[in-house]
Amino acid sequence: MLEDTWEEEIWEYKSKRKPKPVHPNNCSENISESVEKSTDGKHQSKGNEKRTSENPGKTKDHKVCLAETDSQISAGSSQSSSCRDESQQSQNKETTPKKQHRTRRGKQVTPKVRPVYDGYCPSCQMPFSSLLGQTPQWHVFECLDSPPISDTECPEGLLCTSTIPSHYKKYTHILLAQSRDSKEPLGSPSDALAGLFAAAAPGSPCNLEERRSMTLKTENLRKVSDHSLLMMQYLETSQPSAEINRKNVSSPCSQTSPVPQCAEFVKRDQLVGGGSPLAEVALNSQSKSGSMGLPLPENDTDSCEISYSPLHSDEETYDIDQELDDSQQELFFTQSSKDSSLEEDGSAIFENLHGPSPKEAEGIRPTAKSLVAQARCSAPSEGSTLSDSFLLLSYTSNRLSQEDLPHTDAAFHLLSPALAVGGAASNYQTSKAKLDEPEKFLSLASSHQQQKIETSAVGNQTSLPLLTRARSKPLEKEGGKCLPLHPTQSQTRGSPRKGLGAPGANCACRNAQKRSSMPLDKPLGTSPSSPKCSPSQPSKKVMKQMDIGVFFGLPPKRQETSLRESASEGPNVSPVVSPNQKRPRLCKRKAQSSLSDLEFDAKNLNESQHSVGLSGEKRQHRRKRHKTSNSPREGPCQRRSGHLMNNPELGPVSLSKAFVRRTRGRTQRGNMNISESSGAGEVRRTCPFYKRIPGTGFTVDAFQYGEIEGCTAYFLTHFHSDHYAGLSKDFTRPVYCSEITGNLLKKKLRVQEQYIRQLPMDTECVVDSVKVVLLDANHCPGATMILFQLPNGAVILHTGDFRADPSMERSRLAGRKVHTLFLDTTYCSPEYTFPSQQEVIQFAINTAFEAVTLNPRALVVCGTYCIGKEKVFLAIADVLGSKVGMSQEKYKTLQCLNIPEVSSLITTDMCDSLVHLLPMMQINFKGLQSHLKKCGGKYDQILAFRPTGWTHSNNITSTADIIPQTRGNISIYGIPYSEHSSYLEMKRFVQWLKPQKIIPTVNVGSFRSRNTMEKYFKEWRLEAGY
């Protein structure tokens, strides 16, 4: 425990004694860093009071000092404004400044408020604002004493804004630490910004808004729309009479002084929501550069690499929705441009009004105002507080209009589509005189509540061409000053556009109906004279299961259920989730370069796709494609280039992690935990541990996972599709297998011979310093068990698919001490007790011989897979003295075995054989009746065998229990001939081998199944006494 740590700060103890009155002249002008700061601004801790009283001499009016302190605290706490769990609780307890004075003069007990600290832990990078009952010094010492649990780097990297303490124990944040060490931390208050805050005059409009903002805090942020109206009033009072010269490369501080005042108001309102981290970066960087009067460096864009859509944790999203569920806001805006036609795609509705842009002739840049407004219209609602975004963008766009082009481009990268609704505010600075034209407003439903549909999560994504197209065309007019951008397909095919979002555009904002959402069934025409407001539909509210926040005194979380819309009505604006699923993280996308429409279609054919600048015919075609692909039960990340990639083996998919899709060398992130191979286009999954050989770089039967990192040799046990899945002629890594399996790979799959390593049976070979022996697995031709002997002496046996037999006890396994056994557990349950293979083969021989003896025109049919069951039909053919007739394809497959006994008994002449082979799926009455007709009347009876272990039952413990299914002249015997070990055979093999560790390789998908098999393994050990 540190000596300077106050006990009341640790225990959050507040004395009930009357605090000493603070003289108005004793207010400190600057609050020192790393000192406890309260977000509500109504009192300091006792430690701060003591430090304040020790600094007499610095005099200032008490009210001005209080307001300044509040603004500095707000700026200092911007590091943790992306998640305001603590701030919202403290804001609910806030009072106005007048009430504060009464509290200080009276004996009323001060409400207990949890302190919020600035800064980050230098060890784990956790923000100090997330501390509960700890001081920063206390946490740092504990963090240094207890190393992190995992060495896994945080998947969000530099964009991590989590405020959950356990998150920083579960993941490391090395990249974030390096970034904060090499430059000023993102969102930290700059001295220049603080100086601009302090420079505000007492009589400035910001001081008036200061009191208004304090009044708004008492409303617990329940009416977010009031902020928008308040911003209009502020802009009317603070806008300078003469317009700022936008041609200046570096503006003096005197020209930018009104902007930090607005920023002060924004910061004091405590920006909350998904866009807050990026908003603070833009605010700090712009205000700092403005105060220094220097242009931003051109490499800021490359160094920031900030994604357009920030991610939220579940806790962050809860707090955001808690505010937004109580908000009532709709934005009305219009946009003026020359010859600009935007395609309406369901996420927002535009109406373009033709208006003159007199400043365009003067060489003035269109800036990012219209671009930001377009980005908002194409972006999904991300749960951010729209009024805060509104205020921030009015400040940012004003700064953008004064800076050189690199400034505009750098700041544009910092803007999030979630904040882009504030683009409406950007035009207030130039269209003040036209704010009284309500008939020109176009309503845009914010739809920020998260809507729910029963089964699927639809996370809308923003069309990147919408942003880049709007940026690249106006910037090209500047003659080489813009950053290199690849022109989009919409630019190539569409007509040229002129200066979207010119400064003369009319824009305004007002409140509208409560909780409304726009119907998106048809596009809105671009009429310059008669703009219309689209009707809105109220959403229905449903109460869900009580959440944990209610236990801690928070209001119950309310969630919206949107009405089901048909495909013709277009997609939902808000992401929807299943009632039983977690909320999906919003997709984040890199803002590196523009994508053409065709590239984007290949990657993102979903409901939220937006396109711009297409011709009328193309637009109609695209619209039809959207309508045919819209389905309320499909998530956006499930579509791949016009078709669905549904794989039941994927299992539950985590939507809170990054989902990487690769198309033409580009990567885009979404909300699933799988990746797609850029070459084969197949879904790639992580190779499970039971297919990796520990201590080596070997994998066994793991071709469906693509190229596995760290794998030096791929082993294939046998040629069955569930084991060689993913192996094709394009595979270029070494494949180790038996000679028969290698032949099948060459002939059937066309795998290049140079990559096939055929190993002899029962012979010790060395592969990467590991001794390898292939043993007969008694499963199908070429099937092997693989015995590995590592350089350290460890012995590992992988059985692949095998049928245990007593003859294995006389193989090279005899006398071996096996440390780890990878066991085929297909039938690892006592109910699987079927006869041995020899008994079943003998039963089939006797039955077939009897039937043919009684009826010489009887035909024997055996069902087979690609390879396997050869012992059954070869034994029957040998007894009957006949060849086995089969299809041409099956004949070629069996010829690959290079077994003389097999080659001498097979033929493609069906009429010259008494035994026929058919696919296993055709062994039914309908298929056999059809096959009998094909024989041309040569046979009048069929005796069929379906050799599979899946037909067993508890009553079949011997061949005497086998009863055929008969219909007319067709009889089908389901014989329990399995090529996998029965439970008793498996038990005998394990008890003989006595491995130290058993790893099951089949039926391991559930914890219950794995736990059950572990119990069996323990019983076997106890019985065998090892």
Swiss-Prot record:
Zn-finger segments (UBZ4-type): 118-148
Compositional bias (Polar residues): 569-581
Localization annotation: Nucleus
Disulfide bond sites: none
Protein name, as recorded: DNA cross-link repair 1A protein
Catalytic activity: a beta-lactam + H2O = a substituted beta-amino acid
UniProt-listed PANTHER family: DNA CROSS-LINK REPAIR 1A PROTEIN, DNA CROSS-LINK REPAIR PROTEIN PSO2/SNM1-RELATED
Main localization, broad class: nucleus
GO cellular component, one term: nucleus
Ranges of Basic residues composition bias in the record: 98-107, 619-628
Function noted in UniProt: May be required for DNA interstrand cross-link repair. Also required for checkpoint mediated cell cycle arrest in early prophase in response to mitotic spindle poisons.
EC number from the UniProt entry: 3.5.2.6
Residues covered by region (Nuclear localization region): 1-189
Positions of the UniProt region annotated as Disordered: 12-110, 474-542, 560-590, 602-651
Gene3D superfamilies per UniProt: 3.40.50.12650, Ribonuclease Z/Hydroxyacylglutathione hydrolase-like (3.60.15.10)
Domain of life: Eukaryota
